[in-house]
Curated annotation (Swiss-Prot):
One of its GO terms (cellular component) is cytoplasm. This is Putative uncharacterized protein DDB_G0285869. Keywords: Coiled coil. The keyword Transport does not apply. Residues 1-23, 37-56, 122-168, 270-290, 310-432 are annotated as: Disordered. Residues 37-53, 122-147, 154-168, 274-288, 352-378 have a biased composition (Low complexity).
């Protein structure tokens, strides 16, 4: 494209911008005229003052502020955004004027005002011209608190009724209620508190940073000391650290053994032995109560004589069962007292009773066996192995009488030496 075409386009853009600015200014003048009319209605009693205020700096300040809001890049998209901002600002300004109408209707005669706040809108035209970015500056509100104590006398109260209505007028012709002033004061106080809190937070941060730096310095110093100690240990030869001998500690004594269980000895029941009257009386006199005792006197030993029977069973045609009947019926043992007892009861008798002569059943075990042809039987040996007893060979002819228990059993009380038996009486000495 040629350079001339670019210039033409730039001129057209500039003209469009100027036309937009003119239209915006026309809108602003119309709004200002409406505001002036509203101010004239409010202050109908003081027309001259209201006209001066309307033509004065109040409206011009608003126009300049609106112009500053719109000052900058006048693009088509940003225009509507800035127009909305301006519309909201004007809307809030109109609400303030409506509240001021209610204040002017107060007809109280005695009104004392302790605080009079004037809101002035300052234009920062110099700052806007010097701004390079072209950003719009929001209107700055300066709250001036002027404490003016008006003391009215009773005589002058009637003359100053008209002036009380106009006491709330500001320099710009706008009216602000007392509630709004209180709210603004609270806002200012809150802002001051926020500033103080920010300062305290900053102070706390600075203290924490200092503590952190101190901790870092201590940490680095400790690291240096550790490194120096490690280097010294590596340079020196390693020495075996001998630990001192630990003192000998005796082991604790073992726990005492538990007490033994006490068992009561069971009483030994001794059955009484059936003995002769003379021996039983002597034994009973020697026994103590509850203690079993067993004692034998020499008289008991010498009074007993042990003998061995010499009965032999002959090898004959007749059996003992034919001659004398069954041997089981005739097995009778005579005691020294002359009482007959069976051999089965004799087994259960004590040692003293067992010293008597044996029965035919015991002697039958020692009998010799003979052949059927009548050959001689082998001799019987003495059980006691005594030297005084001779071995004799018995033949069937030597037996004159049949083998009966009466002939075989001898009484121990007989002291005759002319007995048919060749055996001598057995005593304890011979048994040994």
């Amino acid at each position: 494209m040629a350079i001339g075409d670019k210039r033409k386009k730039n001129r057209k853009n500039k003209q469009n911008k100027k036309n937009k600015n003119d239209n915006e200014l026309i809108l602003l003048h119309n709004t200002n005229n409406k505001l002036i009319n509203s101010n004239s209605l409010v202050n109908s009693n003081n027309k001259n003052n209201n006209n001066k205020n309307g033509n004065g700096g109040g409206v011009n300040v608003m126009v300049n502020q609106c112009y500053n809001v719109l000052n900058g890049s006048f693009l088509f998209g940003s225009f509507f955004n800035k127009f909305d901002v301006l519309f909201n600002y004007l809307k809030s300004f109109l609400t303030i004027q409506k509240q001021s109408l209610n204040v002017n209707k107060l007809t109280d005669s005695n009104i004392t005002i302790s605080q009079k706040d004037n809101i002035t809108f300052s234009t920062n035209s110099n700052n806007n011209n010097n701004s390079t970015n072209g950003n719009s500056n929001s209107p700055s509100i300066i709250i001036q608190q002027q404490q003016q104590h008006h003391h009215f006398n009773e005589s002058q109260s009637s003359n100053n009724n008209n002036n009380n209505g106009s006491s709330l007028s500001s320099l710009g012709g706008s009216y602000i209620t007392v509630d709004d002033l209180n709210d603004q004061l609270k806002i200012v106080q809150l802002e001051q508190k926020i500033v103080n809190l920010e300062k305290e937070i900053q102070r706390m941060r600075n203290e924490q940073n200092q503590i952190h730096k101190q901790n870092l310095n201590q940490y680095h110093e400790l690291l240096k000391q550790i490194i120096n100690a490690a280097s010294l240990i590596q340079q020196q030869p390693t020495s075996i650290i001998q630990q001192p001998p630990q003192p000998f500690v005796a082991p604790p004594p073992p726990p005492p053994p538990p007490p033994p269980m006490v068992f009561k000895p069971k009483p030994i029941v001794v059955q009484p032995v059936s003995t002769p009257s003379s021996s039983s009386n002597s034994l009973a006199s020697k026994k103590s109560n509850g203690v079993p005792q067993f004692s034998i006197s020499m008289a008991d030993i010498t009074g007993v004589k042990l003998r061995k029977t010499s009965s032999k069973f002959a090898q004959s045609n007749s059996s003992p069962s034919r001659v004398n009947g069954s041997p089981a019926r005739n097995r009778v043992v005579t005691s020294p007292a002359g009482i007959k007892k069976s051999p089965f009861k004799r087994v259960l008798t004590p040692v003293k009773k067992s010293a008597t002569t044996t029965t035919t059943s015991s002697s039958s075990n020692n009998a010799t066996t003979t052949t059927a042809k009548g050959s001689t039987s082998t001799p019987l040996k003495d059980i006691t192995n005594s030297n005084n007893i001779k071995n004799s060979v018995l033949s069937p002819k030597s037996i004159t009488k049949p083998n009966t228990p009466s002939n075989i059993i001898f009484s121990p009380l007989s002291n005759n030496n002319n007995n048919a038996s060749p055996y001598k009486p057995l005593t304890i000495s011979t048994l040994r």
